Amino acid sequence: MKLKVLNAFGVGILVSAACNFTNGQSIEDVVLNVYKEPTCGCCNGWIEHMNDNGYSTAFHHPTNIQKLKDEFGLKNEWRSCHTAVHKDGYYFEGHIPEKFIAQFLSAPPKGAMGLSVPGMPIGGPGMEMGNRFTPYDILLINKDGSHSIFASIKKASEQH
């Protein structure tokens, strides 16, 4: 009897864990785990941008997102509103256009930790506001704590 109860309890935990993933995905299907505040609409816009470009995503609402970013090793100067963690362990911080994530993933630079768009530039994926656009840089962040410019986005059309 105890074994049946324990098995039922274990199955319940697995079913509950599976329900945390969006669109009925299994754990193996998730390519990006996105950590964000529950009320952030621009993060949802970025997730939609990634899904529209063929990525599978799951989102999570940690109790303390800043502490989580500290644990990931993301410096304050690199931060934005959400952090995506790729299944291969790379970090994508903020409103990075999908085409630059694909470029990065096709040949990750040695020692790279990921990419970042610090802040929340107007006109980036998820931050659309009509025809308004603020130029921004995409940073290559490295495991040694350094960073460099991966790409400079001067106009909205360069994001696609």
State each model region's role.
Residues 8-17:
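Bacterial N-terminal signal peptides
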Residues 15, 36-39, 77:
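Secretory pathway export signals and precursors
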Residues 27-47, 53:
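Local sequence-structure signature of Cys/Sec-based thiol-disulfide redox active-site neighborhoods
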